[in-house]
Structure formats: structure tokens, C-alpha cells
Swiss-Prot record:
Keyword annotations of the record: Acyltransferase, Arginine metabolism, Transferase
Keyword Transferase: yes
SUPFAM superfamilies (alphabetical): Acyl-CoA N-acyltransferases (Nat)
Chain's role: Catalyzes the transfer of succinyl-CoA to arginine to produce N(2)-succinylarginine.
Functional pathway: Amino-acid degradation; L-arginine degradation via AST pathway; L-glutamate and succinate from L-arginine: step 1/5
Protein name in UniProt: Arginine N-succinyltransferase
Protein family membership: Belongs to the arginine N-succinyltransferase family.
Residues binding succinyl-CoA, per UniProt: 125
Length: 344
């Protein structure tokens, strides 16, 4: 059975293995053991209440409960940009016009922005390619919403998610090549590694401070503004079905889109509810997959179960209860895994 749980110190080697499979561009999961160990420590201290809000971040892993194999990772940053500035480009417009010459040009322009400062962030989502089956990707991504719903007071009103931009298998980023490299004088893989290992001071020092007309970029770079890496397209679709939208903010390095949503408008948060759980044999039938989570802050767990999402009393097997660290009579959080498709 696949279970979501908080990260532990012993997971570091498994996270190193996952990091080696990302193919680059996942800044927050570098193949660097010291950085990953520090990330785990920060998550543990967050759960223990030892960090200020500006440093808090939760990390979860997807584990096969039978073998102990760690198949994926996901994380939530509580409030971005309160220590180090959190940069985006806002894709806007500048108009240049002359009535006398009968010229009017509305030019797409990139403006350096810190507009998402203080937002909570969904980040570090990666599922081992060998485990991309049977709803594991949905479970990994959406489990975070169950945690946010259960512990709403820990998070801010807006949630953002940076989507990985277009990068090829050799680490070539058209957006970086045409823009960032001119200011930073280093390859994309190098800047990606520096950010992932926490060395971010250079961003503020070297970033272009003035608006940039996108027409000055190569056509290849213009074409990838707000576009996602092919492997990231499913993750984008998942978030958009939960209510997230692209509001013309992009990543400063690869040009990938930043999606955002008010936390209380996220479908899985808004529609999740508490039900009593009982032990038994679940009813047979054509039921949809649902997310089921306990309400235990320090021992949080999420699993998938096929059940009636409208039930008031959820019947789970002994194995499911054990995976959730629950007992009969406890209250668990329940929501349909995917939004119901509207029928005409």
C-alpha cells in the first residue's frame, strides 16, 4: 500500500536516489547530500515548532508500506520570501505610441517582481518514473492539500506553485540562454545547483533591475515563456483542476509558469470533510478513488481508498487503518481524489 508520511532522517539516501533521476531543473531537489540532509532537518524542526515562520517547510515522502521503498517526494514552504527575496518576472505590457506618427505598439515586457512574498508554496514534487502508475502521482501531489486543510492556521491565504520550464535532456534552457546567461555568465545547470544548495545571494546582486522587452529575446525564448517541461504538463493539469491558475508570473531562470490559488478555493481543501472511521470490509461497488488522511500533526498519513465520497461513516480494512495510524472511532479527512467531470 502506498502511504504519504513526513520525511525522516533515514530517508536521505532515498532522496539522493530520487534527485539523481530528476534530469535537472528541479531546483529544490539537488543531488547534494548535505543540502538534502539540511532540508530534512529543517522539516523536522518545523514539525517540532522550533523555527520562525520565515524558515518553516514541510517535506513528505511517498512510501510503499510493504517494502519501505521511497517512491516520491513533495513539500510545502510555509511563507516564501521572508528571509531571501522571492523573485518572479511578471509578464506585462508597455505601450509606446505617437499620434503624430500614427504609431501604436503594445510590447510584452518582463518586470522583476516580489509580489508573491509571504505566500505558501507547493514545491519539490517528484515521483520516481518507475512508480508513475495507479494514481501515485495524484496521491503525492494532492496529499499536501489534506495537510493544509487539517492544519489551515499554519499556512497563508495564497498558495503558489512554480512549474518547471522548458529544458532539454542536456540541460539547455532557451529562456536562460537568451536572458539570464547574459547577466549571470554561467550555464543553467550551474545557477540551478547554486539555488538548490541555498546560495542565492548572487540573484539579487546580478538580476537585471529594469523591465525587459520580450521582443529582444530569441524567438525560441519567447516561445517558452509560461510553458512547462513536457514531464511537468501532467502536474500542471492536476493543479489547474484543483483551481490553480497562471496569472502571468514566470520563473526568472527557465521561464516556467507560476500557478496560484487562494488556499480556501482549492477544491480538495474546500471539499474535504471529517468522517468517522470503522474497521471492516469496505462495500464493493464502482466507487471513485478518494484521499483519506488522519488528523495527526506529527504522524500525518494519507492513503488512497475506493469509497463513496459522500459517506458519513468510512469503513476501512485493518491494513488501511494501520497505514493511517488510526483506530475505529477516529475521525479522518476524506475527499474525492479527482474533481467530478461535469456532464452536459
Amino acid at each position: 500500500m502506498m502511504v504519504i508520511r513526513p520525511v525522516e532522517r533515514s530517508d536521505v539516501s532515498a532522496l539522493m536516489q530520487l534527485a539523481s533521476k530528476t534530469g535537472g531543473g528541479l531546483t529544490s531537489l539537488p543531488a547534494n547530500e548535505a543540502t538534502l540532509s539540511a532540508r530534512i532537518e529543517r522539516a523536522i524542526k518545523t514539525w517540532q515548532g522550533e523555527l520562525p515562520k520565515s524558515e518553516q517547510g514541510y517535506v513528505f515522502v511517498l512510501e510503499d508500506s510493504e517494502t519501505g521503498t521511497v517512491a516520491g517526494i513533495c513539500a510545502i514552504e510555509v511563507a516564501v520570501g521572508l528571509n531571501d527575496p522571492w523573485y518572479n518576472y511578471r509578464v506585462g505590457t508597455l505601450v509606446h505610441a505617437s499620434k503624430e506618427l500614427n504609431v501604436y505598439n503594445a510590447l510584452p515586457t518582463l518586470f522583476l517582481s516580489n509580489d508573491h512574498t509571504g505566500s505558501s508554496e507547493l514545491c519539490t514534487l517528484f515521483l520516481d518514473p518507475d512508480w508513475r502508475k495507479e494514481g501515485n502521482g495524484y496521491l503525492l501531489s494532492k496529499s499536501r492539500f489534506m495537510f493544509m486543510a487539517a492544519f489551515r492556521d499554519k499556512f497563508n491565504d495564497k498558495v503558489v506553485a512554480e512549474m518547471r520550464g522548458v529544458i532539454d535532456e542536456h540541460g539547455y534552457s532557451p529562456f536562460w540562454q537568451s536572458l539570464g546567461k547574459r547577466f549571470f555568465s554561467m550555464d543553467f545547470s550551474r545557477v540551478d545547483f547554486l539555488c538548490g544548495t541555498g546560495q542565492k545571494a548572487f540573484i539579487a546582486e546580478l538580476m537585471p533591475k529594469h523591465p525587459i522587452y520580450t521582443h529582444f529575446l530569441s524567438q525560441e525564448a519567447q516561445d517558452v515563456i509560461g510553458q512547462v517541461h513536457p514531464q511537468t504538463a501532467p502536474a500542471r493539469a492536476v493543479l489547474e483542476k484543483e483551481g490553480f491558475r497562471y496569472r502571468n508570473y514566470i520563473d526568472i531562470f527557465d521561464g516556467g509558469p507560476t500557478l496560484e490559488c487562494d488556499i480556501d478555493r482549492v477544491r480538495a481543501i474546500r471539499k474535504s470533510r471529517l468522517v468517522e472511521v470503522a474497521e471492516g470490509q469496505p462495500a464493493q461497488g464502482d466507487f471513485p478513488a478518494c484521499l483519506v488522511a488522519n488528523e495527526n500533526y506529527h504522524h500525518f498519513r494519507v492513503v488512497l481508498a475506493r469509497t463513496d465520497p459522500a459517506t458519513e461513516r468510512l469503513i476501512l480494512t485493518a491494513a488501511q487503518l494501520d497505514a493511517l495510524k488510526c483506530h475505529a472511532g477516529d475521525r479522518v479527512r476524506l475527499v474525492r481524489l479527482c474533481a467530478e467531470e461535469k456532464t452536459a
